[in-house]
Amino acid sequence: MRNVTSLGWQYLRAFVIIYLCLWAGKAVTLLLPISIPGSILGMLILFALLSSQILPSTWVKPGCHLLIRYMALLFVPIGVGVMQYYDQLTKQFGPIVVSCFVSTLVVMLVVGYSSHYVHRERKVMGSPTHTEEDK
């Protein structure tokens, strides 16, 4: 019984922390004239708290695992909502596919070139150094 109670409190604490970050993000969007959704700001707040180790990751891990486990179920209402526009989607299928393909290609190129640019002068540890005498 004690393990069940302890697990229940861990889930409750995780969901309260996640909800508080969501609420804080929504409050920031109401107070400031920015066009970023409150849920995104809430995730950024949660990320900042976790990455700065102000908030231990073990506190939110049970709730996150539960949400990730049932993530597919959480997307069902969105899929049903998209099906209301099935006629419009079929009419615009070609442009949608082309824009998805082109945007994916552009993102891959930009990420590839920018990563090469950022890491161009970085020396790899353990690799032999070449001097003029070796050539």
UniProtKB/Swiss-Prot annotation:
It is found in: Cell inner membrane. It holds the Pfam family LrgA. It comes from the Bacteria. The chain crosses the membrane at residues 4-24, 30-50, 63-83, 93-113. InterPro entries: LrgA/CidA, Uncharacterised_UPF0299. It is a multi-pass membrane protein. Its main location: membrane. One of its GO terms (cellular component) is plasma membrane. Disulfide bonds: none annotated. Keywords: Cell inner membrane, Cell membrane, Membrane, Transmembrane, Transmembrane helix. Belongs to the UPF0299 family. HAMAP family: UPF0299. This is UPF0299 membrane protein YE2790.
